[in-house]
Amino acid sequence: MRFDEFIMERMGYPWGENEPDKQTRRQAFLVFRQRTGRVDFASLPTMHRWFGLEKYHRPSRQAVFQMAFAMGLDREE
């Protein structure tokens, strides 16, 4: 599972059969920003790539841990 699929599902936007369109990805990104208190884990263009808004880029391990703590995810998630 790619990170964009994982994080979008956590934000309440499951993929289903087809990849979501850009508008759905943007909505998931905005929910993510709200849930994390608008913390800048990286630059905005980089975070957009985590959601596949322009290109795709997987976040660093450190950024993933920071996001997990900010969202209150448990160890298994």
Which stretches of residues belong to each language-model region?
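Short, basic-rich loop-to-helix N-cap that marks the start of a DNA-contacting helix
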Residues: E54-A70
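A short, Lys/Arg-rich alpha-helix, primarily the initiator
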Residues: M1-R35
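Short C-terminal boundary/hinge segments that cap the last helix of small helical domains
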Residues: G72-E77
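Recognition helix of helix-turn-helix/homeodomain-like DNA-binding domains
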Residues: R38-P59
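A broad structural signal for alpha-helix termini and local helix breaks/kinks
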Residues: M11, T36-D40, M71
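Alpha-helix N-cap/N′ positions at the starts of helices
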Residues: R2, F6, A42, P59-Q62
